[in-house]
Amino acid sequence: MENFTEQKGPLGLYDPQFEHDACGIGAVVDIKGRKSHQTVSDALSIVERLEHRAGKDAEGKTGDGVGIMLQISHRFFAKVADELNISLGNEREYGVGMFFFPQNEHLRAQAMKLFELVTRKEGLEFLAWREVPVDPDAVGQKARDCMPAIWQCFIKKPAKVSKGIDFDRKLYVVRRVFEQASNGTYVPSLSSRTIVYKGMFLVHDLRLFYADLQDPDYESAIGMVHSRFSTNTNPSWMRAHPNRFILHNGEINTIKGNTDAMLAREETISSPIMKEDMNKILPIINTSGSDSAMLDNALEFMVMNGMDLPLAVMITIPEPWENNKNISQKKRDFYQYYATMLEPWDGPAAILFSDGDVVGAVLDRNGLRPSRYYITKDGRMILSSEVGVLECAPENILVKDRLRPGKMLLVDTVKGELVDDDKLKADYASRQPYGEWLDSNLIHLRDLKIPNERVPEFAYEERQRMQKAFGYTYEDVKNTILPMARTGAEPTAAMGVDIPLAVRLPVPWAATPRWPC
């Protein structure tokens, strides 16, 4: 049985820091927020037509990962509640959690009991567990061998807590406390607004594996899907997408610096919203996850601390603004202000995101992952890695376009509107006097008076000894280090190794005359 929370470290030629993915993404959204089973079915049809973007094993029976994010269907779960003999209340007055437990019954019972205790300790009412009806025969043998026990839980919203983000924030604290106390259990989702169904499937297996997705009573206005192609990553149930807020195609190539920076901030971090709960949810980033899971951790943290999801995405994955002379001064001030607080999470990557109310898509500023979308006359937005994944009559197409680097496509299902990128960003850029704040508080390094003292240097013999000890070669110094020192530019040199094999060298390699002077 797979341990869903275990960190897999370097082994042989494998190192998790070099993992990359190339995946298929898609979404169907009813812009007016009208829920239907048709949206669920259409989203599943999209992912089934992204088979060429989904990885599979040599036998062709186990996939790298497929999943779907939906709104919680009150009609469906009210029926489930009757079967469980519990009362859920009205829509969004309860949370639904999806759990991947160990198959071992004793370990599963321990984890369930622990979660119930944590829930009650955090002031919430635990209602019931539900074993999710699945068909193990729908998946390959390798997926069955590491398949978790899949359960759902139901939690009642306290009367004093508001619907939406306030209740989800309480559920977030419960989940984080449980995750840090539990070993071997993974929580794909725990929310009052969204739910995630996923696993190590082939694209056609998702619909067949989860009976919930076949039920005509399961209705949603939002369906986001993902098919995973792990180019050099070990597939697992945990690493299938969607995550709790996002799914993505590509990779985050700045992930090490991003996660290190988030960790460093934890020493001084505070929140007027989380208050004393802040210590319960740290660390922000679960470093055993994939790059997209870590990005999801960061976005989730910002949202739970009061930031709108579109705003969190805007400052995490900014458009190319620094050398763009065509953007307004207000927008430039906005990006510069947040750039002092958060480093960009750069891809190449295409991101789909949702909190159950809004659905958005964005390309990072590299713009190297394709995403195309339709807006239809009957009020739907259809987006995918490529066109043709869902049949749509030409006369029903109102807008046909593609995502552009740094630009955001956003649908607000509560207001029932498609939000223009320029209008959205102009609104956020105008909410605070960012320019005044920068003028009053920003300090540039070039303005600091730094003593221009000569840096001590090693004598020739000592420098050569140190260079040998730390593996410096002549090419390192000539082609990389010296140009960096002279120009301040990032290293771009690259060349093959033309040194003879060690067994053919007359003297040890380190003693050969290739060292800088």
Positions of predicted regions on the chain:
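Conserved short alpha-helical segments that host acidic/polar catalytic motifs at enzyme active sites
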Residues: M1-C517
